[in-house]
């Protein structure tokens, strides 16, 4: 049984679950993901591992409640169990030998960026963290980032917390001022990662992006997570999720990401109706 040992609401729409999964915790590395099903009839949800404790045998996942599957997952309480919890899947983020790295996260993507920043910090890498949110109420994991970053910058769209603006502004400034990053690692909305790459490419700063497209089985069989990288078809679940940002076709990825929106909306509405019936 994959029991929820701890539950934490990070903001009104983002939840962290700490799940007892000793075999996964034993092998997990930063950048890898799991696939979870809340209940037997739930959809399979790929989520990048947000943290793990090998001694306690626990794995943390962080998700935003956006559809029927995440609504069902969010309905589970401490001491209850998820139906399936499979992993670790995908390739770990390659960080060996890096001396100076900028980690750029956006929104709930910061949950994926955090374990990478922590792993970099643990190996002695200088870490500059830049994270962006729409407003103060949506800021997550600030204390955790500050603990592992040599420099940490928070950006909000409306200026209600940290600095006003988007993550590319301080990133550009750091590069122009001669930060000499070995690599920029960015995780967040596709449009954000696209513009991070547009910022770094003219300066020839290697940029790694974490791609999280539609995914079903997590083993390369369904082909749902296919991407075009360097003119070739790649599968995020087995070839990634990390890719060279200079090579990713972001426009195609964004188009594919909208293909199932009507179905997702229908499923969410149906789940809301079921929850209303349970309350009544």
Residues of each region from the PLM?
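Ferredoxin-reductase
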Residues: 1-78
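A generic structural signal for residues embedded in beta-strands
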Residues: 36, 84-85, 227
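Short, Lys/Arg- and Gly-enriched loop/turn segments at beta-strand edges
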Residues: 42-51, 89-99, 237
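FNR/FR-type flavoprotein reductase catalytic core
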Residues: 71-216
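Short Fe-S-cluster ligation motifs
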Residues: 235-239, 243-280
């Amino acid at each position: 049984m994959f029991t929820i040992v701890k539950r934490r609401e990070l903001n009104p729409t983002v939840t962290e679950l700490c799940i007892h999964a000793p075999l996964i915790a034993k092998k997990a590395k930063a950048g890898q993901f799991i696939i979870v099903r809340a209940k037997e009839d739930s959809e399979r949800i790929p989520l990048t591992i947000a943290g793990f404790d090998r001694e306690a045998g626990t794995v943390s996942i962080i998700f935003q409640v956006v559809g029927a599957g995440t609504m069902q997952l969010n309905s589970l309480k401490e001491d209850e169990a998820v139906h399936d919890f499979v992993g670790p899947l995908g390739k770990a983020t390659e960080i060996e030998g890096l001396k100076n790295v900028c980690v750029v996260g956006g929104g709930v993507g910061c949950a994926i960026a955090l374990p990478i920043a922590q792993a970099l910090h643990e190996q002695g890498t200088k870490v500059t963290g830049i994270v962006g949110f729409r407003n103060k109420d949506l800021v997550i994991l600030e204390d955790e980032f500050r603990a592992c970053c040599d420099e940490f910058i928070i950006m909000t769209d409306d200026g209600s917390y940290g600095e006003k603006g988007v993550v590319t502004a301080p990133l550009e400034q750091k590069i122009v001022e001669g930060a000499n990053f070995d690599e920029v690692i960015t995780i967040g909305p596709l449009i954000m990662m696209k513009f991070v790459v547009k910022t770094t490419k003219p300066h020839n700063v290697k940029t790694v992006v974490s791609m999280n497209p539609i995914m079903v089985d997590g083993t390369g069989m369904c082909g749902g997570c296919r991407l075009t990288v360097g003119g070739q078809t790649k599968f995020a679940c087995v070839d990634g999720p990390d890719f060279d940002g200079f090579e990713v076709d972001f426009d195609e990825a964004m188009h594919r990401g909208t293909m199932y929106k009507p179905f997702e909306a229908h499923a969410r509405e149906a789940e809301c109706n079921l929850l209303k019936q349970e309350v009544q």
